[in-house]
Amino acid sequence: MKILAVVLISVIVLNTANGENYYPQKYTNDYYGCQKQTDAFCDKVCKLHLADSGFCDQSWGLAKACKCVNVSYDNSFFFNALESQCPLLNKSAA
């Protein structure tokens, strides 16, 4: 039982530390579409969201959206990513 608990905690810690892949959202809570864009566009968008990289993904049928690699869930949202980059925007610091 102790081994199972240690394994579970290890998995949670590794997922939290490494981040995951998420679709970043604009300030309007819409996804960044890439129907007419390239992977380079998505890579720039994702780096603004503090991800390692990004690419154009077509997981939703005909719709294409940018997907970020190794980004935290919080930073997948536009204003959260801004607050992470600029401490002056952080409400709790005021």
Curated annotation (Swiss-Prot):
The keyword Membrane does not apply. GO terms for cellular component: extracellular region. Its main location: secreted. It is found in: Secreted. PROSITE patterns: LCN_CSAB. Residues 20-87 form the LCN-type CS-alpha/beta domain. Keywords: Disulfide bond, G-protein coupled receptor impairing toxin, Ion channel impairing toxin, Neurotoxin, Potassium channel impairing toxin, Secreted, Signal, Toxin, Voltage-gated potassium channel impairing toxin, Voltage-gated sodium channel impairing toxin. It comes from the Eukaryota. The keyword Disulfide bond applies. Residues 1-19 form the signal peptide. Disulfide bonds join 34-56, 42-66, 46-68. Expressed by the venom gland. One of its GO terms (molecular function) is potassium channel regulator activity. Has the structural arrangement of an alpha-helix connected to antiparallel beta-sheets by disulfide bonds (CS-alpha/beta). Belongs to the long (3 C-C) scorpion toxin superfamily. Homodimer; disulfide-linked or monomer (edited version) or heterodimer of an alpha chain (AC D9U299 or AC D9U2A4) and this beta chain (non-edited version). The homodimer inhibits HMG-CoA reductase (HMGCR) (32% of inhibition produced by 0.6 uM), a glycoprotein involved in the control of cholesterol biosynthesis. The inhibitory effects of bumarsin are seen at much lower concentrations (0.6 uM) than that for statins such as atorvastatin (5 mM) and simvastatin (10 uM). In addition to inhibition of HMG-CoA reductase, this protein lowers cholesterol levels by inducing steroid hormone synthesis via StAR, and by increasing reverse cholesterol transport mediated by the induction of ABCA1 and APOA1. The heterodimer non-edited LVP1 induces lipolysis in rat adipocytes. Induction of lipolysis by LVP1 appears to be mediated through the beta-2 adrenergic receptor pathway (ADRB2). This is Lipolysis-activating peptide 1-beta chain. It comes from Lychas mucronatus (Chinese swimming scorpion).
